Amino acid sequence: MESKIVSKAKRLHFVLIPLMAQGHLIPMVDISKILARQGNIVTIVTTPQNASRFAKTVDRARLESGLEINVVKFPIPYKEFGLPKDCETLDTLPSKDLLRRFYDAVDKLQEPMERFLEQQDIPPSCIISDKCLFWTSRTAKRFKIPRIVFHGMCCFSLLSSHNIHLHSPHLSVSSAVEPFPIPGMPHRIEIARAQLPGAFEKLANMDDVREKMRESESEAFGVIVNSFQELEPGYAEAYAEAINKKVWFVGPVSLCNDRMADLFDRGSNGNIAISETECLQFLDSMRPRSVLYVSLGSLCRLIPNQLIELGLGLEESGKPFIWVIKTEEKHMIELDEWLKRENFEERVRGRGIVIKGWSPQAMILSHGSTGGFLTHCGWNSTIEAICFGVPMITWPLFAEQFLNEKLIVEVLNIGVRVGVEIPVRWGDEERLGVLVKKPSVVKAIKLLMDQDCQRVDENDDDNEFVRRRRRIQELAVMAKKAVEEKGSSSINVSILIQDVLEQLSLV
C-alpha cells in the first residue's frame, strides 16, 4: 500500500493486541505495517516468545523504512494458572483441557498493559484486538477510545457464522452430518452441523468466555477484515448490514511484504527447517506451475498413519512437491521413524522436499514454479494462495475451515476437495484415525495439477482446469490492485483512519 505522510497533529496511536497464536499474529503484524506507513504510531502488545516470531520483520520496518512500530512484551503468568513453563502460545498448549487456564492467564495482561499505556507521551487513539481478547473492550472504555475487532476470517465465514448463530438452522436437522442451507447468504450454501466452527460445539468451561467475546464484540466500533471487496462481492455488504457496524477491508495484508527477506521470515518462530537458498534452488529447478506445496497449518495434530497416507499419495502422484510436516512431538517422532525406515526422502529425491517444521510459505507460494497448494483452508493460507494465483486442494481440519472450503470450491471455483467430511478437532485425532486415504490424495492432485501451463488449450472454455487457473489469476490481479493507491483496500485504510479521528472528536 502507498505510504502517506499525515500531519503530526493528526497522528494516531494504534494499539494492536493479537491473540497468542501464529495464525493470528502474522496478519496483525502486517496490519501494523500498513497503519504505520500512513504516518501513524503503532504499538503491538504481546509476550516475549511471540515477539521473537516477528522481531526481524519489525526491526527491518523500523530501520529500513522508518516506520514507528513499537513492541511491548508482558510475560504470561503461567505458573499462577498451572500452565506448562513458558507456555505463551496456543501452538504450544499441550491439551485443550488447558484452554480455559490459558485465556484466564492472558486476561492478566490487562493491568500491566494499561499501566504502560498511561505512561505514554502520545496516548492511545484506538485498540485493534483479536475477537478472543474480550477484556480489551474494558481497556478501550477506560481510555475512552474505540475498539476494533479483528477475527482473522473472511466475510463469507463471518456472515455464515453470524446467520447460523442468529437463526439456529443447525438445530433443526436430524443428525450431525445432515446438510442444511445457511440462511441469508447471497449464494445457496449448505453445510453439516459437524462441519461448523468450534464455537458451535459445547465446551462447558468455555461457554462464559464465548459469551463475553460476543458481548464485547457487540460493543466494538467495527470490524477489520483481511480480505478485499472484489473477492467477496455481496458478502461484504451483507455482513456489515447484519452486524450493523462498520467493516473495513484492508487486505490482502500479506502484500505489504515487498522484500524477499520479509516473505521468507513471515511468521518464523526462529526454528528454521530449511534455508532460503535450499528452498529457492529446488523451486528454480522446476518447470513453471509444476510444484505442489503441501501444508496443513501450524495447529495440525494429525496422527502418523494419516500423514503417511498423505506422503504416499504425494509419491504416487508423480508431481514435484514441497511437503511441510507439523504435528505433535510424539507423532513427529513416530513419523520420522517411518520416513527413515521407508527411505521416503531418498525415494522422492530430486522431485520432493520434506520440511519438518516451519516453512517460508509466502515465499514458496509467490514463486513461479508453485502451481498448487494442498491446504487446511485457514484464512491466512487461503488468501495468500489467492494473492499469488495458486489454486488449491482443500483439506479442512477444524475452526471455520469447512466454511472457507465452501468459498474456495463452490463460490470462487478455485479449488478441488480432497474429500474430508468431518473435522479433526483438538483431542479427537486418535479416535477418528485415518479419514483420507492415499487414492483420494492422488485423485485430488491429478484433478488440480495434471494439466500444466504448457499442455493446456487456453481457449477451451469447457476445460475446468483452464477455468480454475484463469479465475485465480484474475483474483490475484484484483488482490494486487486492491492494495495499490486508489485501490479498494487502500481507500478502506484511509477511511478507517478518518473514522477513528471522527470517533475521537466525539469524546
UniProtKB/Swiss-Prot annotation:
<feature type="binding site">
    <location>
        <position position="298"/>
    </location>
    <ligand>
        <name>UDP-alpha-D-glucose</name>
    </ligand>
</feature>
<keyword id="KW-0808">Transferase</keyword>
<comment type="similarity">
    <text>Belongs to the UDP-glycosyltransferase family.</text>
</comment>
<feature type="binding site">
    <location>
        <begin position="376"/>
        <end position="384"/>
    </location>
    <ligand>
        <name>UDP-alpha-D-glucose</name>
    </ligand>
</feature>
<protein>
    <recommendedName>
        <fullName>UDP-glycosyltransferase 73D1</fullName>
        <ecNumber>2.4.1.-</ecNumber>
    </recommendedName>
</protein>
<dbReference type="GO" id="GO:0035251">
    <property type="term" value="F:UDP-glucosyltransferase activity"/>
</dbReference>
<feature type="binding site">
    <location>
        <begin position="398"/>
        <end position="401"/>
    </location>
    <ligand>
        <name>UDP-alpha-D-glucose</name>
    </ligand>
</feature>
<dbReference type="Pfam" id="PF00201">
    <property type="entry name" value="UDPGT"/>
</dbReference>
<dbReference type="InterPro" id="IPR002213">
    <property type="entry name" value="UDP_glucos_trans"/>
</dbReference>
<keyword id="KW-0328">Glycosyltransferase</keyword>
<feature type="binding site">
    <location>
        <begin position="359"/>
        <end position="361"/>
    </location>
    <ligand>
        <name>UDP-alpha-D-glucose</name>
    </ligand>
</feature>
<dbReference type="InterPro" id="IPR035595">
    <property type="entry name" value="UDP_glycos_trans_CS"/>
</dbReference>
